[in-house]
């Protein structure tokens, strides 16, 4: 007799409020306040002496993997990276505390966006218990103080629905465009070059890159890529040339990510072949632990 219950309760979500999406004042208010929540400087040059850009990329990749494995809301990861960048822009931080800071930022973002937020204990497990729950809770107060409790930051996800509503797209294609745009937004959050970009530009560039990419495989828009870029720039009051440059950078980040993934796959296959040929290492000192 099987007593284990395999039923999974579906996530209950509120319907999108059409009154908010149809009111242009909401979009204008987002555009007005978005820059309040950007990092104040490129902190690698003037604030951080111990942390390098590649370290941020590593902790960002780890944070993204945690959010994906825990099936967090799409907004959690970009919001956590916003907290991390704003903190690092004002507080010199030793590299030994970077993962702790990343865990705290996920902890705060999930509290704001999740119905069942990540727990301190679970986040500590993801650090291989290199930090303790009490340490995470103490740093939570430190980060909150440095951010002045301004946690409701505007992120690219806040613009997605407003942008999609104004595009002449087939309704059945919107979910696919939305999914691709969300992927681009997550990729942008892992790359520091986008940290100083307004969220509206990242959102607009991500939607444009998603539609133009899908356009190569199937008809998802009646507009050409150039006409689409001009329309997107008009929606968010963005300079067309700046938007084109942003979209090209997003596409370059995607290409680099795909190439890295393929390289990792090849390296993995090569390692498996080598293990098959020699089941024991020829020199124990060559093993990097």
Swiss-Prot record:
Domain of life, source organism: Eukaryota
In-chain residues carrying the UniProt-annotated modification Phosphoserine: 271
Its job: Regulatory component of the cyclin D2-CDK4 (DC) complex that phosphorylates and inhibits members of the retinoblastoma (RB) protein family including RB1 and regulates the cell-cycle during G(1)/S transition. Phosphorylation of RB1 allows dissociation of the transcription factor E2F from the RB/E2F complex and the subsequent transcription of E2F target genes which are responsible for the progression through the G(1) phase. Hypophosphorylates RB1 in early G(1) phase. Cyclin D-CDK4 complexes are major integrators of various mitogenenic and antimitogenic signals.
tRNA processing found in the keyword field: no
Region Disordered, residue ranges: 264-289
Domain spans labelled Cyclin N-terminal: 26-151
UniProt cross-references to Pfam families, sorted A to Z: Cyclin_C, Cyclin_N
Subunit structure: Interacts with either CDK4 or CDK6 protein kinase to form a serine/threonine kinase holoenzyme complex. The cyclin subunit imparts substrate specificity to the complex.
Keyword Membrane (UniProt): yes
Biological processes, Gene Ontology terms: adult locomotory behavior; cell division; cellular response to X-ray; G1/S transition of mitotic cell cycle; long-term memory; negative regulation of apoptotic process; positive regulation of cell population proliferation; positive regulation of G1/S transition of mitotic cell cycle
Similarity remark: Belongs to the cyclin family. Cyclin D subfamily.
Compartments, as annotated in UniProt: Nucleus; Cytoplasm; Nucleus membrane
Organism: Homo sapiens
Protein name: G1/S-specific cyclin-D2
InterPro entries recorded: Cyclin, Cyclin-like_dom, Cyclin-like_sf, Cyclin_C-dom, Cyclin_N, Cyclins_cyclin-box
Annotated SMART domains: CYCLIN, Cyclin_C
Modified residues (Phosphothreonine): 280
Alphabetical list of PANTHER family matching this protein: CYCLINS
GO CC terms in record: chromatin; cyclin D2-CDK4 complex; cyclin-dependent protein kinase holoenzyme complex; cytoplasm; cytosol; microtubule organizing center; nuclear membrane; nucleolus
């Amino acid at each position: 007799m099987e007593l284990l219950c395999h039923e999974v309760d579906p996530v209950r979500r509120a319907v999108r409020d059409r009154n908010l999406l149809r009111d242009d004042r909401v979009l204008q208010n987002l555009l007005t306040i978005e820059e309040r929540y950007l990092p104040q400087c490129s902190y690698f040059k003037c604030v951080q002496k111990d942390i390098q850009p590649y370290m941020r990329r590593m902790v960002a990749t780890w944070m993204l993997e945690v959010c994906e494995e825990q099936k967090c809301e799409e907004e959690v990861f970009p919001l956590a990276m916003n907290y991390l960048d704003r903190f690092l822009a004002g507080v010199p931080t030793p590299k030994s505390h970077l993962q702790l800071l990343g865990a705290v930022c996920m902890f705060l973002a999930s509290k704001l966006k999740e119905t069942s937020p990540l727990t301190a204990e679970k986040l500590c497990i993801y650090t291989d218990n290199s930090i303790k729950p009490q340490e995470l809770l103490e740093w939570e107060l430190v980060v909150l103080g440095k951010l002045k409790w301004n946690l409701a930051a505007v992120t690219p996800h806040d613009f997605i629905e407003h942008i999609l509503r104004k595009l002449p797209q087939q309704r059945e294609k919107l979910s696919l465009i939305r999914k691709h745009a969300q992927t681009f937004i997550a990729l942008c959050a892992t790359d520091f070059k986008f940290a100083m970009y307004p969220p509206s530009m990242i959102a607009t560039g991500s939607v444009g890159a998603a539609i133009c990419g899908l356009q190569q495989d199937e008809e998802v828009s009646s507009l050409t890529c150039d006409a689409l870029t001009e329309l997107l720039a008009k929606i968010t009051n963005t300079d067309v040339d700046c938007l084109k440059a942003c979209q090209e950078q997003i596409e370059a980040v995607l290409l680099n990510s795909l190439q890295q993934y393929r390289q990792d796959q090849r390296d993995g296959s090569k390692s498996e072949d080598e293990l098959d040929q020699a089941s024991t290492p020829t020199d124990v000192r060559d093993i990097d632990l």
